[in-house]
Amino acid sequence: MTFKVAAAPISWGVSEVPGWGRILEPERVLSEMAGLGVHATELGPPGYLPDPPTIIGRNGLELVGGFLAVPMHDASAAEGSVAEASATAKKIAAGGGEIVVLAAATGLDGYDGRPQLDDAQWATLIDTCRRITEVVTAEGLRVAMHPHVGTHVETEAEIERFLADSPMPLCLDTGHLLVGGTDPVALAERHPTRIGHLHLKDVRADLAAEVRAGRVGFADAVARGLFVPLGDGDVDTEAMVRSVHAAGYHGWYVLEQDTALGPDSDDCGPRRNTARSLVHLDEVFSRIREGR
């Protein structure tokens, strides 16, 4: 029984959000992943790995896929979003990856503001997803929608509406789902056939509630420690892994801990936190393998 584990640059503070924090060099991030025994990674934000096959292969890693947040609800921007998805898919395919992880961006910087969509904008979003699916699958890749804080597919109601209106599978991100007010395990059990990809995160429920209530912005919450190593927060990682495994999921378990590095942050922190998460995840996998 094999569980495929990958990491992602966001655990080292590498984000597409302007002003997010200090960005560590790719060689350091990838070499630390490899040093922890992780053999696969997602791409990171656009431009972070300009030549994925070379730099990832040099560190003994394989490419899983990449995250892409683009506006899909605005008819005037849809063409550009489809083109960006096509370019991203080509880069991932060239690097040997298999999936584009899509998020329905608002068009604003960051994830702190989220205008509501009317029915026409929602219909455009769904149609843009269809068009993006076409260009991504043309490259031999899969695509999955990532419900994400501060996007147009965030809340439980929006996720259910999306599943009803689009055949696209989901990337279940345990942290973003919980922050957005969705029980990730319950969602996986309701829709076992729609699980396309998995991001394993853990979060503090107290800070998640503050974000949900609008009292704390997402970026501020991240800086205050919203995301923690697996097993240290309020997500039931083991229940999630057991649920998707029972549903027949054989894809990647991508370990993530959204992190922002300030001027005085300890650059060794991401490696230590990822190591702790890996220990917890390995214990979960061991119990499942042993039938416990």
Describe the predicted segments one by one.
Residues 7, 127-234, 285-288, 292:
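Acidic/histidine-rich catalytic cores of soluble enzymes
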Residues 265-290:
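C-terminal helical cap(s) of enzyme catalytic domains, especially alpha/beta-barrels
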Residues 7, 33, 41, 56, ...:
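Conserved, mostly hydrophobic/aromatic
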Residues 58, 77-171, 179, 272:
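Active-site acidic/histidine proton-transfer and metal-coordination neighborhood
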Residues 2-9, 40, 62-67, 98-101, ...:
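Structural preference for beta-strand elements that scaffold enzyme active sites
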Residues 11-25, 71-81, 114-121, 229-231:
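Active-site mouth loops of central-metabolism enzymes
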